[in-house]
Swiss-Prot record:
Reactions catalysed, as given in the entry: Random hydrolysis of (1->4)-beta-D-mannosidic linkages in mannans, galactomannans and glucomannans
Family, as annotated: Belongs to the glycosyl hydrolase 26 family.
Stretches assigned to the CBM6 domain: 22-141
Species per Swiss-Prot/TrEMBL record: Piromyces sp
UniProt-listed PROSITE patterns: CBM10, CBM6, GH26
Span of domain GH26: 165-459
GO terms, biological process: substituted mannan metabolic process
One Pfam family cited in the UniProt record for this chain: CBM_35
Ranges of residues in domain CBM10: 491-527, 534-571
Extent of the signal sequence: 1-19
Keywords attached to this entry: Glycosidase, Hydrolase, Repeat, Signal
MF (Gene Ontology): carbohydrate binding; mannan endo-1,4-beta-mannosidase activity
Record's protein name: Mannan endo-1,4-beta-mannosidase B
């Protein structure tokens, strides 16, 4: 193990130490609606810079050449002296995500993160969305990055130490499959839960599958709403769905929080309501009292879900990095409102079935200690893997939080996600035309994505309706390491080497230190090598069965089972 760790370190050291930066000047690229400038601004490289991206679709594209396929760090040298701007990055003609350019007064480097480039020539472009900025150069390293480790630093437990067993099991399930599988997901009709209407019907007809992750929206459940579904109400719908599938499904929820100010009608769009988030997070105001009553109402619904052991991936205050919702584009007040929601729901109402998903701005105000999972909403013009967006969010949290596509228009190409290490925990396509119209998804595309070997659908899920469950690793302290040292050091040689002891005894590697296994995506030492059981199927390219498995086939090698849609050796 020591030699293996040293080898990995040396590889990373070589890449990071000797990679050189190569500049590709914007003024030498292909220009569409932008102009080359050579004065006004100073501090640029080359012979000039380009701007101003005045109209949607204006772009600059450069051709770069790399020695091998891989992930390459990209830096854009820019000036945004007309205010903060958001514009779109393309790589080889595909959308790679939106880039936020912070306001400045001179040319500065913006590290965009890693992008996937093929061996040989590739194109990198910037396309106007908000426009009105200047670009000097695109800069990449001349050697690819080492592969990103997406699992080893994940928080081992939920942030709520009182989480119910069903929520613990769901989180462990998501964590265990993160970096290996991508779960399918779909949004149904507004105000519905477990809705098997036209969206689900289209998927099932085209693919023969049901999504792993379903969605509900408390859009009509605030006190100001004058209409909401009845008989059944939204909670009854969710419970009926939970019972129908015997707990073998995952439900997510957002809350388009309709609310009225002192004048005007209720709404969730900022332009349609006079309600103030700044006042709402100030105790003693009528706005504060109003949000507490709304939270209490929704909490009453979620309590009914908890009563039947139903966990919920909870996504309130979604898309708060934008300015279209009344809670958006106000980082300090939004973070404060998030904490009010958490304290009221968890500590006051005792809602311990929630997995808290943050879908918004990443900055110094982000309430990191109140977040389990990170969600990103992307409505791209193509089926690109959105690797840049994935890396930006994953890196901000230091690899401690899973990142999912909490909303998408087009499903990202699954194989490209795998190739580019964009391990979205799940995708969740919006309803209506985004899943119904061929302009977004053809039947062939849906079948390709839902039946891809990496994608997990509802038929592969276990039941999460459990009354007892302990985390597979860690404890209820997200600041601790992922090590699960259940065996004492006198029994396990790996403890002094910085690795936990294995709970099981399946050998996947042996060196001078002893026998090693892998549990929870981490090396672990097998304490009593005399009792070790060799995973014979590893040598044949197949894992050993993790749980007890029915025998599907027997040959000269041994008995075979099936887990997660793949053969596994029974030991």
């Amino acid at each position: 193990m020591n030699s293996l760790s040293l080898l990995l370190f040396c590889i990373f050291f070589v890449f990071s130490t000797f990679a050189k930066k190569v500049y590709y000047e914007a003024e030498n690229g292909k220009l569409d609606g932008v102009t080359v400038y050579k004065s006004d601004l100073t501090g640029f490289s080359g012979t000039g810079y380009v701007g101003r991206f005045e109209n949607p679709g204006n772009s600059v594209t450069v051709t770069v050449e790399v020695p091998q396929t891989g992930m390459y760090d990209l830096t854009i040298v820019y000036c945004a002296n007309m205010g903060q701007k958001i514009n779109s990055l393309t790589v080889n003609g595909q959308s790679a995500g939106d880039i936020t350019f912070t306001e400045n007064t001179k040319f500065e480097d913006l590290n965009v993160g890693a992008i996937y480039l093929n061996k040989g020539k590739n194109t990198i472009g910037l396309v106007s969305s908000w426009g009105w900025m200047w670009v000097d150069a695109f800069v990449i390293n001349d050697a690819p990055n080492a592969a990103k480790d997406v699992t080893s630093k994940l928080n081992p437990t939920l942030i709520n130490p009182k989480a119910i067993p069903a929520a613990k099991k769901l989180y462990d399930f998501l964590k265990t499959n993160y970096g290996k599988r991508i779960l399918s997901g779909q949004v149904g009709a507004a105000g519905q839960a477990g809705d098997e209407g036209q969206e689900i019907q289209r998927i099932q007809k085209a693919t023969g599958k049901l999504p792993a992750v379903w969605n509900m929206d408390f859009i009509f459940e605030s006190n100001d709403c004058t209409w909401r579904p009845q008989n059944p109400d939204i909670t009854e719908m969710a419970i009926n769905w939970w019972k129908k599938y015997q707990g073998k499904g995952i439900m997510s929820a957002q809350w388009h929080w309709n609310i009225a100010g002192k004048t005007g009608d209720f709404a969730f769009y900022k332009k349609d309501t006079t309600f103030s988030i700044d006042n709402a997070v100030t105790e003693g105001t009528w706005e504060y009292e109003k949000i507490i009553k709304d939270i209490d109402r929704v909490a009453g619904h979620i309590k009914k879900l908890q009563a039947v052991n139903m966990p919920l991936i909870w996504r309130p205050l979604h898309e708060n990095d934008g300015d279209w919702f009344w809670w958006g584009n106000n980082p300090k007040s939004c973070a404060k409102l998030w904490k009010i929601l958490y304290e009221r729901m968890v500590n006051y109402h005792g809602l311990n079935n929630l997995i808290w998903l943050w879908n918004g701005k990443n900055d110094a105000n982000t309430p990191v200690d109140y977040i389990d999972i990170i969600g990103v909403d992307i409505y791209a013009n193509d089926h690109g893997p959105q690797t840049t967006a994935y890396n930006t969010h994953f890196d901000f949290y230091g690899g401690k939080k899973m990142v999912v596509l909490s909303e998408n228009g087009r499903i990202p190409d699954i194989q490209q996600c795998v190739d580019q290490n964009a391990w979205w925990g799940y995708f969740q396509t919006w309803n209506s035309e985004f899943i119904l119209q061929d302009s977004y998804h053809t039947d062939a595309q849906l079948k390709e994505y839902f039946t891809h070997k990496t994608v997990m659908n509802m038929d592969e899920l276990p039941s999460f309706n459990v009354n007892s469950y302990e985390y597979q690793s860690g404890n209820n302290n997200n600041n601790s390491s992922n090590n699960n040292n259940n065996n004492n050091s006198s029994e396990c040689f790996s403890i002094p080497l910085g690795y936990p002891c294995c709970k099981g005894n399946t050998v996947v590697y042996t060196d001078n230190d002893g026998d090693w296994g892998v549990e929870n995506n981490e090396w672990c030492g097998i304490g009593n090598s005399s009792s070790a059981v060799v995973c014979w199927s590893e040598a044949l390219g197949y894992p050993c069965c993790v749980s007890s498995s029915d025998v599907y086939y027997t040959d000269n090698d041994g008995e075979w089972g099936v887990e997660n849609g793949d053969w596994c050796g029974i030991i």
